[in-house]
A protein has these predicted regions:
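Amphipathic, interface-forming alpha-helical segments with heptad-repeat character
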Residues: 22, 30-41, 45-178
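Short helix-to-loop capping/linker segments positioned immediately adjacent to catalytic or ligand/cofactor-binding
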Residues: 16-18, 125-131, 141-146, 184-186, ...
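Hydrophobic alpha-helical segments and their boundary regions
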Residues: 6-7, 23, 32, 66, ...
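Long, charge-rich amphipathic alpha-helical coiled-coil "stalk/tentacle" segments
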Residues: 166-212
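Single-pass alpha-helical transmembrane signal-anchor segments
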Residues: 1-19
Length: 212
């Protein structure tokens, strides 16, 4: 009787210790005897002791990968520093686990290569004014390339585009000159309107005096 009770307690402990609760927006990749068995979605699951193991816990939420600045060369041979932000989701936990050794390293390398290829076909001015187009091209290329890894790229953003200091200085001077030009135009238009209003006021006053 005591032996039976001990066995029951051990079985109960074994079951409890092998209960797994998968939270919302998560997935568990399960291996049985070293080989892929199944993928658990949200809910309560029981793992077979000694036979099954959780190979990987995967988040299904959108994730953000903020990569450090990468040196890139434009079509007109200007070297710039550009850092990218990639927003992605894991859509297939099995492929994500077994498709590639280090997914994040692979995404970073792929992002850098794709960015260099796109920027290499554009001149500096195009790079500075075509950010949305570059973002869109990168997203399409990265999404297609990462699909075999169980990853969907939702969007890509170029966070900073930093040309060489001498070009930055020239751009700042050009922007300052453009601001001053616009201010001068606005000032001249304001003075013109004021002069017109003053002339119209004097004209009306003269008419009133003549009528009197």
């Amino acid at each position: 009787m005591i032996v039976l009770a001990i066995i029951l307690v051990l079985v109960l402990v074994l079951i409890i210790t092998n209960l797994c609760v998968v939270q919302q927006a998560q997935a568990y990749v399960i291996e049985r005897l070293g080989a892929y068995s199944t993928t658990w979605g949200k809910g309560l699951h029981v793992k077979l002791p000694f036979i099954e193991r959780v190979a990987r816990r995967v988040s299904l939420k959108e994730q953000v990968a903020d990569f450090p600045p990468q040196p890139v060369i434009t079509k007109d041979n200007v070297t710039m520093q550009i850092d990218t932000v990639v927003y992605f989701q894991i859509t297939d936990p099995k492929l994500y686990t077994y498709g590639i050794e280090q997914p994040m390293v692979a995404i970073e390398t792929l992002s850098a290569t794709t960015l260099r290829n796109i920027i290499g076909d554009l001149e500096l001015d195009q790079c500075l004014t075509s950010r949305d187009i570059i973002n869109s091209k990168m997203r399409v290329i990265l999404d297609e390339a990462t699909d075999p890894w169980g990853i969907k790229v939702n969007r890509v953003e170029l966070k900073n585009i930093l040309p060489p200091k001498e070009i930055q200085s020239a751009m700042e001077k050009q922007m300052k000159a453009e601001r001053e030009r616009r201010e001068a135009i606005l000032r001249a238009e304001g003075e013109k309107r004021a002069a017109i209003l003053e002339a119209e006021g004097e004209k009306e006053s003269a008419i009133l005096r003549a009528d009197a």
